Structures are given as C-alpha cells and as structure tokens.
Amino acid sequence: MATSAAAHGEHAEDHGHDEHAHPTGWRRSTNHKDIGTLYLIFAIIAGVIGAAMSLAIRAELMYPGVEYFHNTHLYNVFVTSHGVIMIFFMVMPAMIGGFGNWFLPLMIGAPDMAFPRMNNISFWLLPASFGLLLMSTFVEGEPGANGAGAGWTMYVPLSSSGHPGPAVDLAIFSLHIAGASSILGAINFITTILNMRAPGMTLHKMPLFAWSVLITAFLLLLSLPVLAGAITMLLTDRNFGTTFFAPEGGGDPLLYQHLFWFFGHPEVYILILPGFGMISHIISTFSRKPVFGYIGMVYAMAAIGGLGFVVWAHHMYIVGMDLDTEAYFVSATMIIAVPTGIKIFSWIATMWGGSIEFATPMLWALAFIFLFTVGGVTGVVLANASLDRVLHDTYYVVAHFHYVLSLGAIFAIFAGWYYWFPKMSGYMYNETLAEAHFWLIFIGVNLIFFPEHFLGISGMPRRYIDYPDAFAGWNLVSSIGSYISGFSVLLFIYCVYDAFAKNVPVGDNPWGAGATTLEWTLPSPPPVHEFEVLPRVE
C-alpha cells in the first residue's frame, strides 16, 4: 500500500509539473491551490472595477448638483453594479473561493477538494457571470437609457415595468450563474470537510477557519435556491406574462422582497463568517496563544448562521407588516448580537495576556474587531422598527453596512491576504509598504463612512444623484475619504508587485510559534500535491 501510494505520488507530481508547463495549465487545472489563486486574481480585478465605480459615485456626490452623470439613469446603474460586483465578484470569490480553496484542504490535511473538476467549473462560471453583468450595462434598461439601475436588490416594480429593456434580464442571468457557481462550491466544501479530514481530526479539533467555511457553505446551499426562485419569477413576470409580483394579476410585490431578503440576510453572514474564521487564526497567531473559548467560537458561528435565516424582514420594517410580526423581527435581530458579542469578547480574551506582535495582518485584525463592532452597534440601532421608520433608506443604513462590509469583510480579506501571502507565493512582502497600505485605507474608509451616519440622521436618502445644499459639508468629507481609499488600492497593487519583484524568500512558517495549523508545516509555496502521506492529528 505504501509503495503504491508513493508511486501514485510520483505520477501526480509529474502530472502537476506538466500542468504548469502547458500553456493551458491554469485553464484546465483542478488543483485547489491553482483554483484558489484564480479566484483571488479574479476578486482583485473585480474589486478594482467595483472600487472605480464607488469613486465615480463619490465624485458625483462631492458637491450638490448633477456634475458628471448627466444621464442620471447611469448613476443608478453605477450604484447597482457597484453593489453586485463587490458582493458576488469580490468578497465571495476572495473569501470562500480564494482563501477557502487555498487553505481549507491544507488545514484539514486533505490532498485536495472532494470534487476537483467541479471546483474548476465553479470558478469558470464566474467570469461568464461577470461578463453578463457587464453586458447588461450596454443594452437598454429604462426607456431610452442603458443598463440595469434597479439597485442590487432589484425590487419590483422598478426591475419589472420600470425596466422594459433587456438589461435587467441579463443581470438576472448573471445572478443565476453566480448562484450556480456558489452552490457547486458549497457542495464541494461540505463534502470535503465531512469526508476528507486527516485521521484524528475530529470536527471539534478542526481549525476555526474550516468551521467558518463549513457554516458558510450550508448558508449558501440553503439561501441561494430561494434567490434563484425569486429572480426566475421576476424573469417570467418580465417576459412571459406571469404575475407573481404584479398586483393587477393577483400577485404581490412584497412577496419578492420576502424571497429576496430570505436569501439576502443569510448572504450578509456568508460575506462575514469566513472573515470571522480568518480573524480568529490571525489574532491567535500574533498573540502567541490558542483562541479563547474554541467551542464557544464554533457554536457562536453556528448560532449566527442559524439565526441569520429568521430575521430577514428587518429589511422591510416600512412595508406595513403586522405590529406583532415587527416585534418578533426586532427581538430576533437583537438576539444575533449575543453570539456576535461572544466572538468579539473571545478575540479580546485571546489577546489578553498574550505576547502580541503588531505585524501587518494583526493590524488589519485589530482594526476589524473595532470597526466591525461599530458596524454592529449601528446595526442594533437599525434593528428597532421604530427608529428604522426614520432611518430606513437613508445614509445611516449605507454607513452601517459599509462598516461591516467595507471596514469588516474587506479588512478581514486584507488580513488574510497579508497573513497567507508568504505561504501562497513563497515571498515576503515589504512590511513598510504593507503598513502604509493599512493606514491609508484605514483613514480613507473611516473618512468616507463615519460622516454618513450624520447625513443619515439628518435625513439624506440613499441612491440619489443630487441632494439639498444642507448636506454638502459631510458629503465633501466623505468624497475626500474615497479618494484616499482609491489611492490605497494603487498602493496595494504596487505592494504585490514589489513582493514579486524583490523575491525575498520565506520559510515554512514566517510567523513563529503562534501559527499552529497544518499549512505552516508545509513549504512556502506548498508542493503541487501536498499530504501524499496523510498527516495524523493528535
């Protein structure tokens, strides 16, 4: 048996070598590390496009009056595309597709993912999906104007009768394909984690990042089919005369909102849970301590995932639901703060008494804890139906979810990037450049989004191209912040270029005694086929 395993290993090595020598190696590779790298490159490209759109939005809002988007529908298209791109083509491919594919098999001691060829198509569906979304901006949406400008939520009737052209149809197909990609990926992750752990690695010994990916995969598997159903009904309403969401045919536009948010709320937890997992590893590594309350951390994530499915209507307080219904959703939403608080305090307890090293990944992780907490506090404010009466669809909501996404998920992605970059590439980045990137984006995004709380409380509504002069001051501050953040993206790309240009080699484990998971026992970068003899976990 040992001989055959070794022989198989040699054969696999040769195949892996050919794969990279061949010009189509990247395209056809079924290796989880190659696919993870493709996901990360795709996420960076999509992120730059999405960030460019947000810069255009903030440039327009810098001063009152319509300045750049003289075709005002185009502004709505930018807002819509920015949202869809950042969620479906940047955060999800980076966290789940990128870091998930790269490190989940390494962490659990698996030779690869359970279904490597399915993994390949999970990735390649995404460029197709992205292409459809970009195509939608070049065909008619509203009469006489190109592109889908219904918001990333695509609420009816704006996305049905409000957009008679084919743009929204293309956007719907784009979401279908992105959803198919995520469902296939989720099946792959669940199977891999349940069936391919190294001998001795029970579920309760599994690294927290692996747990976060498992829970995220279940959320994807349960929520995406609901989105698929909703947008398919929207498609038939638009093209085939059905009236699922059209009152004149006995339909209900609120049904769309319920279906959408039944997907949409688990989705925002899908966007942050893998980040929780990454942050746990980074805090533990740079505090030189095991995570405080491991089991509590696992079940807190599971509780967040479960509760995420029963709070969706807190996005809909103003649609006229029954008061008892609203009371339920207020209470359920606030209960999610409990497991989230367990995680925050466990991270702080992990650092307590630790030998903390403020390396770049640790800076991102510390900023994540602070800024995610700010986003959580404004979330508790918005959970109150009575307050949401006033704050719904104002910039207060924009500030809230950008604090948990732009200053939460993105900070977690960058934390993971700087933490694992030496392992993925075999090179060390320039610490000074990396810290400059951190401080620049930290100042930038806080300048953008903190003042937006004030705008929201003052009553400035979201998704408008123009605003009364009274809101000019904080909008100027916000837009200046977006220029700083935009520059930080360029610095990040230069930082990556610099690391590959300088070629500073790195050992198996650049982080020292704090890094205890299996990937740090492998060379940097790992061989094409790791774990030919499965590791045994004690």
UniProtKB/Swiss-Prot annotation:
Primary site of residence: membrane
Domain of life: Bacteria
Region annotated Disordered, chain positions: 1-27
A Pfam family hit: COX1
Assigned keywords, A-Z: Cell membrane, Copper, Electron transport, Heme, Iron, Membrane, Metal-binding, Respiratory chain, Translocase, Transmembrane, Transmembrane helix, Transport
Enzyme class: translocase
Pathway the protein takes part in: Energy metabolism; oxidative phosphorylation
Catalytic activities: 4 Fe(II)-[cytochrome c] + O2 + 8 H(+)(in) = 4 Fe(III)-[cytochrome c] + 2 H2O + 4 H(+)(out)
Keyword flag Phosphoprotein: no
Binding site for heme a3: H400
Binding residue positions for Fe(II)-heme a: H82, H402
Bias type Basic and acidic residues, positions: 8-22
Subcellular location: Cell membrane
Membrane topology recorded in Swiss-Prot or TrEMBL: Multi-pass membrane protein
GO process annotations (BP): electron transport coupled proton transport; oxidative phosphorylation; respiratory electron transport chain
Sequence position, cross-link 1'-histidyl-3'-tyrosine (His-Tyr): H265-Y269
Example GO molecular function: cytochrome-c oxidase activity
Positions of transmembrane segments: 37-57, 84-104, 121-141, 170-190, 208-228, 259-279, 291-311, 329-349, 362-382, 401-421, 438-458, 476-496
PROSITE patterns to which the protein is assigned, alphabetical: COX1, COX1_CUB
Enzyme Commission number: 7.1.1.9
GO cellular component: plasma membrane; respiratory chain complex IV
InterPro entries associated with the record: Cyt_c_oxase-like_su1_dom (IPR023616), Cyt_c_oxase-like_su1_sf (IPR036927), Cyt_C_Oxase_1 (IPR000883), Cyt_c_Oxase_su1_BS (IPR023615), Cyt_c_oxase_su1_dom (IPR033944), Cyt_c_oxidase_su1_bac (IPR014241)
Binding site for Cu cation: H265, Y269, H314, H315
Family: Belongs to the heme-copper respiratory oxidase family.
Job of this protein: Cytochrome c oxidase is the component of the respiratory chain that catalyzes the reduction of oxygen to water. Subunits 1-3 form the functional core of the enzyme complex. CO I is the catalytic subunit of the enzyme. Electrons originating in cytochrome c are transferred via the copper A center of subunit 2 and heme A of subunit 1 to the bimetallic center formed by heme A3 and copper B.
Name of this chain's protein: Cytochrome c oxidase subunit 1
Species name: Rhizobium leguminosarum
Gene: ctaD
